[in-house]
Swiss-Prot record:
Protein name listed in UniProt: Protein S100-A14
Annotated EF-hand domain residues: 27-61
Gene this chain is encoded by: S100a14
Any one Gene Ontology cellular component term annotated for this protein: perinuclear region of cytoplasm
Subunit: Homodimer. Interacts with AGER.
InterPro entries recorded: EF-hand-dom_pair, S100_Ca-bd_sub
Superkingdom field: Eukaryota
Protein purpose: Modulates P53/TP53 protein levels, and thereby plays a role in the regulation of cell survival and apoptosis. Depending on the context, it can promote cell proliferation or apoptosis. Plays a role in the regulation of cell migration by modulating the levels of MMP2, a matrix protease that is under transcriptional control of P53/TP53. Does not bind calcium.
Xref: SUPFAM superfamilies: EF-hand
Gene Ontology biological-process annotations: apoptotic process; defense response to bacterium; positive regulation of granulocyte chemotaxis; positive regulation of monocyte chemotaxis; response to lipopolysaccharide; toll-like receptor 4 signaling pathway
């Protein structure tokens, strides 16, 4: 995959719904990565992000601690965006569509 360009306000109109959703995920990842590098989250930062931003898709009683412990390379207690993306994929699996979305 190619590199993603950063969007500014005027470009946002051109983005599809999915592109805006991905941009929102990236912004939230960086918003919660306060300790150390912006490219990684500590397990505590990831826990905060998930409990505050995904309370309905991934409630705290769903084995969140185990999922965080099993993500990526936890040797240095830093999780990269790919690990966050993996967790988002797990949360997305719980979403059930009532009916297929039709394209217009």
């Amino acid at each position: 995959m190619g590199q993603c360009r950063s969007a500014n306000a005027e470009d946002a109109q051109e983005f599809s719904d999915v592109e805006r959703a991905i941009e929102t995920l990236i912004k939230n990842f960086h918003k919660y990565s306060v300790a150390g590098k912006k490219e990684t989250l500590t397990p505590a930062e990831l826990r905060d992000l998930v409990t505050q931003q995904l309370p309905h898709l991934m409630p705290s009683n769903c084995g969140l601690e185990e999922k965080i412990a099993n993500l990526g390379n936890c040797n240095d207690s830093k999780l990269e965006f790919g690990s966050f993306w993996e967790l988002i994929g797990e949360a997305a699996k719980s979403v059930k569509m009532e009916r297929p979305v039709t394209r217009s």
